[in-house]
C-alpha cells in the first residue's frame, strides 16, 4: 500500500520545475494570457496541457499532449485553465503539496493583475484565456465545493459529490446518526464522510475546495482492490462505500436490512422463472442496491424495459421435468434513491476491455412501476457521472443539482450549466431520488435540494 497520498511515481520535482510552474501559474492567474493552442494540431481546446519541462502545449483529449510526453519523457504538465498538475504517465490529475501551495498563493496575489499591460512582444501570439472560457467561474459556497484530485482520484470525487448532494444522505448526517467525535473506531469511513459533510456545509469554511485525504487513506487501508494510483472505476467505489458504511452503521447480512444506508439505497428484485408446460413459478427475491443496464436502446426507458423483459431460458422444472421456461426480473420494492449504471465497459472476443460510446437519452424526472400492479413512483435526477476519454486514459466529471440549479464539477472546478447540457451528456452513472418520501403513515416529507 502506498505510504503517501500525494503526487505520483512520475512527479520528481527539480528546482527548475518549480520555477517553470510558478511562471505558468503567474500567466494563468494574473494576466490571463497563456499559450492555449495545441503545438501539434494548432487548435484551441477546452483541456490543454502545457509541458512543465518545456514550452510545448498539447490538447488532452486529442492525445497530442500525451504523444509529446511519451516522445520526450516529459510526463508532467499543467492545465492552462486552472493550473492543476497533470501526469501523462498516470493519465490523471495529481496532487503535490508544494505545487498546490504555490498555485494557491499566486491565485490570490492581487498585485499581479496589472502585469498584462506590460506584456513582452512574444505574448502577442498567445491566446487570451478569458475569451475561451465557456462559462463564468462559480465561487464555492457552503454545500457546493470542488474536491481536490489527489492523484488519479477523480473516480472517488464524483461519487463523493453524489453522496454530498443526495438530500436523504445529507439529512441523515445532519441528524447526527453518526458523529466522528463520538466514534471509538480507529478506522471508520463513516466518520470521514461525517467530517466531509461538516466541512463542506460549514458556512464559515472559506476554502474553495475539499481535500479528501481521510477518505483516500481509509479506502487504501480497507480495500485492496481500490488501493494505489492506478485507474479505478467510479461504480466500484460507490458499491464499496455503501457496503462500508452499511457495516459501520450496524448492518448485518440478513435481508431486508434496516440500517440507515439500506433504507436510503436498497430495494428488492424478484427473479421469476415460469415453466412453459406446467406454468409453475419459481420466485427468488434478491437485494437491489443499483441497476446495471446494457446499452441496447437509445433511451433510459428503453433500457429499463429491456432489463425487465421476458427471456427464454433452459430450466429443469421440479414439477414436470420440462426444460423450457421464461425468466423475468420484476422490481419488488423500489428504493428511495436509485443508482443506474449504463454499462459502458465490456470485454471483446480477445478478453480486452473496451468502452461503448453510444448515446443514451434520459429524463430529469422518471416514473417507475414495481410489482406489476403497484402505484407508480416518481423520481428526480440529482447527479450524473460521466467518463471522458478511453478506459485506460479517462477522467471522471460530475453534474449535480443544487439549490434549483445544475453545476458541472470537474475536480476543484465548478461551473453553472443549463439542464440541457446535463441531459445531453454521455452518462455513466445516473442518480435519482424519490420526489416524495413517506416516513410514516401520518407524515409525508418532500425531498427538495
From Swiss-Prot:
Zn(2+) 4 binds at residues 178, 183, 188, 191. The keyword Cytoplasm does not apply. Keywords: Hydrolase, Metal-binding, Nucleus, Protease, Thiol protease, Ubl conjugation pathway, Zinc, Zinc-finger. CDD domains: Peptidase_C19D. Its EC number is 3.4.19.12. It holds the Pfam family UCH. Zn(2+) 1 binds at residues 8, 10, 87, 90. One of its GO terms (biological process) is proteolysis. The active site is at 154 (nucleophile), 395 (proton acceptor). It is found in: Nucleus; Nucleus, Nucleoplasm. SUPFAM superfamilies: Cysteine proteinases, RING/U-box. The keyword Zinc-finger applies. Gene3D superfamilies: Cysteine proteinases, Zinc/RING finger domain, C3HC4 (zinc finger). Zn(2+) 2 binds at residues 38, 41, 59, 64. A zinc finger (UBP-type) spans 6-113. Zn(2+) 3 binds at residues 51, 54, 68, 74. Disulfide bonds: none annotated. It catalyses: Thiol-dependent hydrolysis of ester, thioester, amide, peptide and isopeptide bonds formed by the C-terminal Gly of ubiquitin (a 76-residue protein attached to proteins as an intracellular targeting signal). GO terms for cellular component: cytosol; DUBm complex; nucleoplasm; nucleus; SAGA complex. Residues 145-435 form the USP domain. One of its GO terms (molecular function) is zinc ion binding. The UBP-type zinc finger domain is required for the interaction with the SAGA complex. Component of the 1.8 MDa SAGA (Spt-Ada-Gcn5 acetyltransferase) complex, which is composed of 19 subunits tra1, spt7, taf5, ngg1/ada3, sgf73, spt20, spt8, taf12, taf6, hfi1/ada1, ubp8, gcn5, ada2, spt3, sgf29, taf10, taf9, sgf11 and sus1. Belongs to the peptidase C19 family. UBP8 subfamily. Histone deubiquitinating enzyme component of the transcription coactivator SAGA complex. SAGA acts as a general cofactor required for essentially all RNA polymerase II transcription. At the promoters, SAGA is required for transcription pre-initiation complex (PIC) recruitment. This is Probable ubiquitin carboxyl-terminal hydrolase 8. It comes from Schizosaccharomyces pombe (strain 972 / ATCC 24843). The lineage of its organism: Eukaryota, Fungi, Dikarya, Ascomycota, Taphrinomycotina.
Amino acid at each position: 500500500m502506498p505510504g503517501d497520498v500525494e503526487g505520483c511515481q512520475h512527479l520528481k520535482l527539480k528546482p527548475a520545475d518549480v520555477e517553470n510552474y510558478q511562471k505558468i501559474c503567474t500567466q494563468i492567474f494574473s494576466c490571463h494570457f497563456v499559450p492555449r493552442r495545441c503545438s501539434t494540431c494548432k487548435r484551441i481546446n477546452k483541456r490543454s496541457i502545457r509541458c512543465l519541462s518545456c514550452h510545448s502545449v498539447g490538447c488532452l483529449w486529442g492525445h497530442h499532449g500525451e504523444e509529446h510526453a511519451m516522445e520526450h519523457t516529459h510526463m508532467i504538465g499543467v492545465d492552462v485553465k486552472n493550473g492543476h498538475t497533470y501526469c501523462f504517465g498516470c493519465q490523471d490529475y495529481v496532487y503535490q503539496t508544494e505545487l498546490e501551495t504555490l498555485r494557491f498563493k499566486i491565485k490570490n496575489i492581487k498585485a499581479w493583475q496589472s502585469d498584462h499591460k506590460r506584456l513582452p512582444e512574444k505574448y502577442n501570439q498567445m491566446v487570451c484565456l478569458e475569451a475561451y472560457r465557456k462559462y463564468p467561474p462559480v465561487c464555492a459556497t457552503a454545500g457546493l465545493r470542488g474536491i481536490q484530485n489527489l492523484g488519479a482520484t477523480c473516480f472517488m470525487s464524483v461519487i463523493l459529490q453524489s453522496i454530498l448532494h443526495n438530500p436523504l444522505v445529507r439529512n441523515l448526517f445532519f441528524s447526527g446518526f453518526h458523529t466522528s467525535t463520538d466514534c471509538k473506531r480507529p478506522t471508520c469511513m463513516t466518520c470521514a464522510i461525517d467530517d466531509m459533510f461538516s466541512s463542506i456545509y460549514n458556512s464559515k469554511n472559506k476554502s474553495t475546495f475539499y481535500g479528501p485525504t481521510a477518505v483516500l487513506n481509509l479506502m487504501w487501508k480497507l480495500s485492496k482492490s481500490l488501493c494505489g494510483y492506478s485507474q479505478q472505476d467510479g461504480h466500484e467505489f460507490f458499491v464499496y462505500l455503501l457496503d462500508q458504511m452499511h457495516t459501520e452503521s450496524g448492518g448485518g447480512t440478513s435481508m431486508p436490512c434496516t440500517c440507515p444506508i439500506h433504507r436510503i439505497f436498497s430495494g428488492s428484485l424478484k427473479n421469476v422463472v415460469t415453466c412453459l408446460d406446467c406454468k409453475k413459478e419459481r420466485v427468488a427475491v434478491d437485494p437491489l442496491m443499483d441497476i446495471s443496464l446494457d446499452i441496447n436502446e437509445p433511451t433510459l426507458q428503453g433500457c429499463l424495459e429491456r432489463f425487465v423483459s421476458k427471456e427464454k431460458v433452459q430450466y429443469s422444472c421440479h414439477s414436470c421435468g420440462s426444460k423450457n421456461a421464461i425468466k423475468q426480473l420484476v422490481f419488488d420494492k423500489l428504493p428511495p434513491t436509485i443508482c443506474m449504471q449504463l454499462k459502458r465497459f465490456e470485454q471483446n472476443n480477445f478478453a480486452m476491455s473496451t468502452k461503448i460510446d453510444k448515446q443514451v437519452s434520459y429524463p430529469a424526472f422518471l416514473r417507475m412501476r414495481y410489482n406489476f400492479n403497484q402505484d407508480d413512483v416518481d423520481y428526480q435526477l440529482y447527479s450524473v457521472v460521466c467518463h471522458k476519454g478511453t478506459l485506460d486514459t479517462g477522467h471522471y466529471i460530475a453534474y449535480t443539482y443544487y439549490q434549483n440549479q445544475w453545476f458541472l464539477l470537474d475536480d476543484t472546478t465548478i461551473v453553472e450549466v443549463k439542464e440541457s447540457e446535463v441531459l445531453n451528456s454521455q452518462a455513466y452513472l445516473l442518480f435519482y431520488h424519490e420526489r416524495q418520501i413517506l416516513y410514516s403513515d401520518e407524515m409525508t416529507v418532500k425531498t427538495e435540494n
